[in-house]
């Protein structure tokens, strides 16, 4: 075990605070509409240019081990806020640094760190209640666009695109962000349920130009096991032929004789049919087949449920308005399932999401939820250079997370105004003793930090902005840093999701309060490099 270096009390806190300040100084320049870019060197390829606080924080590693410990703890604030709310990382970093800076001063002056921590926790809890109470529910597509625009650093096209995507796929729908092959940024929406299985034989293709199967008003047979021969299916196939409608078969696999018979029938024109493999594996496959059954108002044919293939009637088949099958994907559009049964299934999946502890399971359940709820939207981010695409993708990711958070918990005035106004929740709050009250005052001062930084990044003195807003009785009045004017933030569309503001403060308060109470820091003593081997003497090749 290697020897350790230990720092105590003021010495430890000073070194830790230095690391926090270095990280915060690099991150805080990105805050607000006039925030600056940070250029990050990469081991290979072009440097990365970003205005995303968490991306900057994740790149910072300091040479001094004690300074680095402080920086890494605040980096944790940014990461945690990003994981929970998806945005607000720079705000969280600025708040944490402010709380820690003030707290370290008071500890150095002889105050009790544990009492200061109690005061900080008490104040944060009171402010969170205030933010939740003041949050306004997001109702219109225009409000969603405003949130997206602010989170994307004032890019209105991004805000409009996200609002359109959410409008198409619903609040539970999946919206993914990918890099495009072109210079344009575009939105691609897949309506209905899509899964990643294509046709089992190219002979099923009905549209030779696009190499895809198009079935109008088809019946859908959902079968859990493999189909090896069609003997058991003959009654249902005859019933489908008489109905004159096409048939989509979804099963674990269709092989050998069964597949050959279907292909021959399709080519002869007797039966419009296509077969695809069931999506997923194991228990997840069964669950997805049940989802398809709910969506199409059909029944899953499973011997576990006591249903045999030879006993299937046409009423047990699912129905859809349209089915499109390509080489690798199948899309079921406008299934016949009733709204009530689909909503019941959605509620069941939401319950499973809340119960599961596995991130992987959660992601897969979320995908199933989206497919049932309305579809998938893909925002393809274009740009002239790779650096531009990556920078834009960072902003769109932030904007997407912010809009989801806004839909979840509502919006509050943006630009740091919500935190500044939330100081009113602390005006009558007193601690059990003077040190606890001092902890409350630390948070009171820290609530000004984000708006000060936004003002300073736009070239305006922060104290003047804070003073002017403090004098006003209008709770929505704030500083529009883009145009350097004072406006009603809600009317001007400068809003933040309440969840982002709340999470940023909670995470900042939690980590900063812990760091204030740290009394010792321990790190490895760096190993000294071994002395280089001596050079060869005379006659050893050193002519």
Curated annotation (Swiss-Prot):
Major location category of this protein: cytoplasm
Q: What is a single Pfam family found in this protein's UniProt entry?
A: Cpn60_TCP1
- Provide a GO biological process annotation: protein refolding
The entry's keywords: ATP-binding, Chaperone, Cytoplasm, Isomerase, Nucleotide-binding
What Gene Ontology terms describe where this protein resides (cellular component)? Answer: cytoplasm
State the reactions this protein catalyses: ATP + H2O + a folded polypeptide = ADP + phosphate + an unfolded polypeptide
The GO terms describing molecular function are: ATP binding; ATP-dependent protein folding chaperone; isomerase activity; unfolded protein binding
Which cell locations does it reside in? Cytoplasm
Q: What is its EC number?
A: 5.6.1.7
Q: Please give the function described in this protein's UniProt entry.
A: Together with its co-chaperonin GroES, plays an essential role in assisting protein folding. The GroEL-GroES system forms a nano-cage that allows encapsulation of the non-native substrate proteins and provides a physical environment optimized to promote and accelerate protein folding.
HAMAP family hit by this protein: CH60
Q: Which NCBIfam families match?
A: GroEL, PRK00013.1, PRK12849.1, PRK12850.1, PRK12851.1
Subunit structure and binding partners? Forms a cylinder of 14 subunits composed of two heptameric rings stacked back-to-back. Interacts with the co-chaperonin GroES.
The name of this protein is Chaperonin GroEL 1
Q: Which organism encodes this protein?
A: Mesorhizobium japonicum (strain LMG 29417 / CECT 9101 / MAFF 303099)
């Amino acid at each position: 075990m290697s020897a350790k270096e230990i720092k105590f009390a003021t010495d430890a806190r000073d070194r830790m605070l230095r690391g926090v300040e270095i990280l915060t100084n690099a991150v805080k320049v990105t805050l607000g509409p006039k925030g600056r870019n940070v250029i990050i060197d990469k081991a290979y390829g072009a440097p990365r240019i970003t205005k995303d606080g968490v991306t900057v924080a994740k790149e910072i590693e300091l040479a001094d081990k004690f300074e680095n410990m402080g920086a890494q703890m605040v980096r944790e604030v940014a990461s945690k806020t990003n994981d929970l709310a998806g945005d607000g990382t720079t705000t969280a970093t600025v708040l944490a640094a402010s709380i820690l800076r003030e707290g370290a001063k008071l500890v150095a002056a002889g105050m009790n760190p544990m009492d200061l921590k109690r005061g900080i926790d008490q104040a944060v809890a009171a402010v969170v209640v205030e933010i939740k109470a003041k949050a306004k529910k997001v109702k219109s597509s225009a409000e969603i666009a405003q949130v997206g625009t602010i989170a994307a650093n004032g890019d209105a096209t991004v805000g409009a695109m996200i609002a359109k995507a959410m409008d198409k796929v619903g609040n539970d729908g999946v919206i993914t962000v990918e890099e495009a092959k072109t210079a344009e940024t575009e939105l691609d929406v897949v309506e209905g349920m899509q899964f990643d299985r294509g046709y089992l034989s190219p002979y099923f293709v009905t549209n030779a130009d696009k190499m895809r199967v198009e079935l109008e008003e088809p019946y859908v047979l959902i079968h859990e096991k493999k189909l090896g021969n069609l003997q058991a299916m003959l009654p249902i196939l005859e019933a489908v032929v008489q109905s004159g409608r096409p048939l989509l078969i979804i099963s674990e696999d269709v092989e050998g004789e069964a597949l050959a018979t279907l292909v021959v029938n399709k080519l002869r024109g007797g039966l419009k049919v296509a077969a695809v493999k069931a999506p997923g594996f194991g228990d997840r496959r069964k669950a997805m087949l049940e989802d398809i059954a709910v969506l199409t108002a059909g029944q899953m044919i499973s011997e576990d449920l006591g249903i045999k293939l030879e006993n299937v009637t046409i009423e047990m088949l699912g129905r859809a308005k349209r089915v499109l099958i390509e080489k690798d994907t199948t899309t079921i559009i406008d299934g016949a399932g009733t709204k009530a049964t689909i909503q019941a299934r959605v509620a069941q999946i939401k319950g499973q999401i809340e119960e599961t502890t596995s991130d992987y399971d959660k992601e897969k359940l979320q995908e199933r939820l989206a497919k049932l709820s309305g579809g998938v939207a893909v925002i393809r981010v274009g740009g002239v250079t790779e650096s531009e695409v990556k920078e834009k993708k960072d902003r769109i990711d932030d904007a997407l997370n912010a809009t989801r958070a806004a839909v979840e918990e509502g919006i509050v005035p943006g630009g740091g105004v919500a935190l500044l106004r939330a100081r009113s929740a602390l005006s009558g709050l007193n601690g059990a003793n003077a040190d606890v009250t001092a902890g409350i005052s630390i948070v009171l001062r820290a609530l000004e930090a984000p708006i000060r930084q936004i003002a300073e990044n736009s070239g305006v003195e922060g104290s003047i902005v804070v003073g002017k807003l403090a004098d006003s009785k209008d709770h929505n009045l704030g500083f529009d840093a883009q145009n350097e004017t004072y406006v009603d933030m809600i009317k001007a569309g400068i809003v933040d999701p309440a969840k982002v503001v709340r999470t940023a403060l909670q995470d900042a308060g939690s980590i900063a309060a812990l760091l204030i109470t740290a009394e010792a820091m321990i790190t490895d003593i760096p190993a000294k490099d071994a002395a280089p081997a001596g050079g060869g003497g005379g006659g050893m090749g050193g002519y």
